[in-house]
């Protein structure tokens, strides 16, 4: 299991990203818009760079909700492959059945 501080750091990044998502999108739209003056686009770039690094969705790591495992995590279920197998075998995940042919 991952350290609790690492899991909490990722949760903090998720909350910061959700809070500043609209502001980032607005600034990026200004930067990409060619009809706006170069000076205004530059000021938007400066404002974007002043935002916290953790407000970018790139910094969020997809982790298992139960164990905090960073790799082998299924997005649909938000759990790792190991936990998915355990929960699936005891029937805790609705609609998930063991394959047989």
Swiss-Prot record:
One GO CC annotation: cytoplasm
Keyword Heme: no
Domain of life: Bacteria
A GO biological process held by the record: translation
Disulfide-linked positions: none
Keywords from the UniProt entry: Ribonucleoprotein, Ribosomal protein, RNA-binding, rRNA-binding
Gene Ontology molecular function, alphabetical: rRNA binding; structural constituent of ribosome
Transmembrane segments: none
Any one Pfam family match given in the protein's UniProt record, by short name: Ribosomal_S14
PANTHER family: 30S RIBOSOMAL PROTEIN S14, SMALL RIBOSOMAL SUBUNIT PROTEIN US14M
Role summary: Binds 16S rRNA, required for the assembly of 30S particles and may also be responsible for determining the conformation of the 16S rRNA at the A site.
HAMAP family from the UniProt entry: Ribosomal_uS14_1 (MF_00537)
Subunit comment: Part of the 30S ribosomal subunit. Contacts proteins S3 and S10.
Similarity field: Belongs to the universal ribosomal protein uS14 family.
Protein name per Swiss-Prot or TrEMBL: Small ribosomal subunit protein uS14
Source organism (scientific name): Ehrlichia chaffeensis (strain ATCC CRL-10679 / Arkansas)
UniProt lineage: Bacteria, Pseudomonadati, Pseudomonadota, Alphaproteobacteria, Rickettsiales
């Amino acid at each position: 299991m991952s350290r609790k501080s690492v899991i909490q750091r990722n949760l903090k990044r998720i909350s910061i990203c959700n809070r500043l998502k609209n502001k980032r999108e607005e600034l990026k739209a200004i930067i990409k818009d060619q009809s706006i003056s170069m000076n205004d686009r530059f000021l938007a770039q400066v404002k974007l760079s002043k935002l916290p690094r953790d407000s970018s969705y790139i910094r969020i790591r997809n982790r298992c909700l139960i164990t905090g495992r960073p790799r082998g995590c299924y997005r649909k279920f938000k759990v790792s492959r190991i936990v998915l197998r355990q929960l699936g075998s005891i029937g805790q995940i609705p609609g998930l059945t063991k394959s047989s042919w």
